[in-house]
Design a protein with these regions (language model features):
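Non-transmembrane, aqueous-exposed alpha-helical and coiled segments at domain scale
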Residues: 1-226
Length: 226
């Protein structure tokens, strides 16, 4: 019975690496899209609170069967705020039940697609983003869900970490140390207007542009898509 199924599937199965190599030899481009997030990476994430694979950019090569030299542009996709599913460290998490954390969750419908479990929400951690930019060799950022912050009068962004009152330069490798860090926040004025119909960066309110430009500055990566 199952061998019959195999014959039905045979025309759709091939060595992906070979297929992609032929496409590249024709001068065509291929877009690879990853899932999950850098800090869920089994090698570079917040182990043991990780997934079982490598969601980082390098897996575009190992997962597809192409050589790493074929990858010549990497776009980092990041929400305008930070979320996490399940357990694990979350430096900028908002634990309120009726404040900005709740507002982000409800406005952004931040609930698990399959389980319906509420996602943990917090202010954007640009310090983590800086680590991710280095690890993934990001060329630019694609910032999503900026409109979820439309009704926020004040917006915060984490631009660094402190331990015992002293700022640190890198994210600690030890979860025990990471649990002790305090976020260094910068506060921004909200734009308090609906931006969902805006289609160019220049049309954005000045407050939104200020927020995005600071995000780019801290991460060390230019904005590519908003």
């Amino acid at each position: 019975e199952f061998l019959a199924y195999a014959e039905e599937l045979r025309p759709y199965i091939a060595d992906t690496g070979v297929v992609l190599d032929e496409i590249f030899s024709e001068g065509k481009n291929v877009l690879f899209e990853g899932a999950q997030a850098t800090f869920l990476d089994i090698d570079h994430g917040t182990y043991p609170y990780v997934t079982s694979s490598n969601p980082t950019a390098g897996n575009a090569s190992t997962g597809s069967g192409i050589g790493p030299r074929y990858i010549d542009h990497v776009v980092g996709v990041v929400k305008a705020y930070t979320t996490r599913v399940g357990e694990g460290p979350f430096v900028t998490e908002l634990l309120d039940t009726d404040g900005p954390g709740h507002q982000i969750r409800e406005t952004g419908h931040e609930y698990g697609t399959v389980t319906g479990r509420p996602r943990r929400c917090g202010w954007l951690d640009a310090f983590m983003l800086k680590y991710s930019a280095r690890l993934n060799s990001l060329d630019c950022l694609a910032v999503t869900r900026l409109d979820i912050l439309d009704k926020m009068p004040k917006i915060k962004m984490c631009v660094g970490y402190k331990i015992d009152g002293q700022e640190i330069k890198q994210i600690p490798a030890s979860l025990n140390v990471l649990a002790k860090v305090e976020p260094v926040f910068e506060e921004f004025e909200g734009w308090l207007t609906d931006i969902t119909s805006i289609r160019t960066f220049d049309e954005l309110p000045v407050q939104a542009k200020t927020y995005l430009n600071r995000l780019s500055e801290v991460a060390g990566v230019e904005l590519g898509i908003v």
